[in-house]
Every structure is written in structure tokens, then in C-alpha cells.
Amino acid sequence: MNYPHPIIAREGWPFIAIAAVIALLIHAVGGFGFAWPFWLLLVFVVQFFRDPQRPIPAQPNAVLCPADGRIVAVETAHDPYANREALKISVFMNVFNVHSQRSPVDGAITKVEYFPGAFLNAAIDKASTENERNAVVIQTASGKTVTSVQIAGLIARRILCYVRAGEPLSRGQRYGFIRFGSRVDVYLPLGSRAKVSIGEKVYASSTILAELEQ
């Protein structure tokens, strides 16, 4: 079952209200000829904060995509948050993607750790280690460790995370949000099988990133 939430993310309500008030005031004073760019801005803000429900695949060993976007890395890398070698899959989100983050697996959170950092272009590799980021480490019922890392970007400078260590997470459960373009890295146990490739467009909760080794 998908985690219930408004179709327009709560994180965007203040921005939408401000954009709507500005558009209305300018329209009232100068008419549509002056106000249309601000109405266009309002439409952009609303679409940015959309947060639609998504179908969740039923395969028990599937690792779901935590965010909408495009795959920019599928590689073996060191997972500094769980201190291991891992399969790393990275998703880059541009300003037109949905920006909520959802849990890739069922499990219990063993660690939530925030790191201040830079605001480099989130599409480049060194954003993984140099940018502001927040790591959520999850242990599945079978003992597998999955790390999901929210990473700020050039424009995105606000990471929101709503979970803490010790709490359970369900696959597809909404646990965070990053405003205005960003990246999510997922670290999986070696032996996991990637089901996506670089450049592929992916969707939170409904795209299978990988399959855990059984």
C-alpha cells in the first residue's frame, strides 16, 4: 500500500500561496498582460511540488527507486555510511521531476546521519561526497543493508528528512523531500543485480532499481 499524502506536497504550500498572491495582485493592478509571467510561475511551482501516488511492484527482493529522475551512475563504490563496498546507483533529479523521496525497501532504520557540504551540480560524481547530504541506512528483515542518501544540488539547498533511527519503513513510504533539483544515491550489498542503466528515466516507487541477492 502506498503511503498516503496530498497530491501537492505540503512542502510546497507556502511557495504556492506566495506565487498565487503575487499573480493576483499584479493581475488586479496591471491586468493579464503584465501578470501572465507570474501566472506561469505559479503553474511551474505547482507542478514542481506535485507528489502523485505510484504503484508499488510486488516482488519481495526488489529495491525500488527512491526518487524520480535519470540514472547517472551504476557502479561498485565504497559506502561510507555503512563502511562497506557496495553497488551504487545514483538518480539525478532536475527541476521538472517530483522531488519527494520514498523508501526503496521494507526494513528498520539503523542510522540517519546529516552532513553539511557544498552545493555543486548534483549530476556530477563528486556531489556524492562533497555536497550537503543526509543518509538513511535501512536493514531489511533478511539482514541486508540498504543506504539511501539525499544530496543537495546547485539549486536545491534544503534537504528535509522525516524519519529517525529505530523507526520502521515500508517500501514506497515517503520519508523526505529535496527542493529544486538534487540527487539520491542508493548503496546495495554486492551481489545485488542492477535492473537499470545509465541515462534511463526512472520513477519513485514504481521503477525497480535492483534485486537483492536471495
From Swiss-Prot:
The keyword Lipid metabolism applies. Heterodimer of a large membrane-associated beta subunit and a small pyruvoyl-containing alpha subunit. The modification Pyruvic acid (Ser) is found at S182. The keyword Lipid biosynthesis applies. It comes from the Bacteria. Belongs to the phosphatidylserine decarboxylase family. PSD-A subfamily. Its cofactor is pyruvate. This is Phosphatidylserine decarboxylase proenzyme. Keywords: Cell membrane, Decarboxylase, Lipid biosynthesis, Lipid metabolism, Lyase, Membrane, Phospholipid biosynthesis, Phospholipid metabolism, Pyruvate, Zymogen. The active site is at S182 (schiff-base intermediate with substrate). Catalyzes the formation of phosphatidylethanolamine (PtdEtn) from phosphatidylserine (PtdSer). It is a peripheral membrane protein. Pfam families: PS_Dcarbxylase (PF02666). Binds 1 pyruvoyl group covalently per subunit. GO terms for biological process: phosphatidylethanolamine biosynthetic process. GO terms for cellular component: plasma membrane. The record marks G181, S182 as: Cleavage (non-hydrolytic). The gene is psd. GO terms for molecular function: phosphatidylserine decarboxylase activity. Its EC number is 4.1.1.65. It is an enzyme of class 4 (lyase). Is synthesized initially as an inactive proenzyme. Formation of the active enzyme involves a self-maturation process in which the active site pyruvoyl group is generated from an internal serine residue via an autocatalytic post-translational modification. Two non-identical subunits are generated from the proenzyme in this reaction, and the pyruvate is formed at the N-terminus of the alpha chain, which is derived from the carboxyl end of the proenzyme. It catalyses: a 1,2-diacyl-sn-glycero-3-phospho-L-serine + H(+) = a 1,2-diacyl-sn-glycero-3-phosphoethanolamine + CO2. It is found in: Cell membrane. Pathway: Phospholipid metabolism; phosphatidylethanolamine biosynthesis; phosphatidylethanolamine from CDP-diacylglycerol: step 2/2.
